């Protein structure tokens, strides 16, 4: 069901109103940059890599956890579907969410990911696992568009696509490396169990949430007032 949802967009596409594109204002953030701001780009890439790595713990390890809890095997598929459905949800009400959390939006999003992972690592109840998948997906889906938007800002219009390609590349890198990083950690620490990946990344994410709270005025971890002041 989740994977058929893009068909809704295709069906509605003929009803979109076409507007002629207007030049970027000379005073915009993009036009102030002559080249890509590499330090900011690297920090955005690192942040995107980590939240992707942490959130994808659910997709890689939920099946093992569900099996260990002796729940129906199909339930892991339900959890993963809910996770991806929750990733889509913030885009529908993004402005409202930013209006509520304002400068703490990234803090809240990272905290949601961490809380979702802890739900998997601590609770055995089906309801809490559903809550965990929804929280982690919602937090991840909230941060994605913000990272993409910040990436576009740090580059002039002619280089914005290149900057975005670098950021999106680390998404696939995180997908590829996630199981290897977690398995390496478990081998080095001799910690084993179906809950370990969730508790490990839950603690790492909690640490990042604390850092984001302390550095909420930072370009990467914070959110500029221009996002919520009209």
Regions found by a protein language model. Give the residues of each.
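Symmetry-related core transmembrane helices of the 12-TM Major Facilitator Superfamily/SLC fold
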Residues: 2-15, 196-213
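Juxtamembrane intracellular "pre-TM" segments in multi-pass secondary transporters
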Residues: 16-47, 230
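Extracytoplasmic gate region of multi-pass secondary transporters
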Residues: 40-81, 87
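Intracellular helix-loop hinge segments at the cytoplasmic ends of transmembrane helices
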Residues: 63, 145-154
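Helix-to-loop junctions at the C-terminal end of transmembrane segments
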Residues: 90-102, 186-187
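C-terminal transmembrane helical hairpin of 12-TM major facilitator-type secondary transporters
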Residues: 103-147
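A late C-terminal transmembrane helix in Major Facilitator Superfamily
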Residues: 154-190
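Intrinsic disorder in cytosolic terminal tails and internal cytosolic loops
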Residues: 215-230
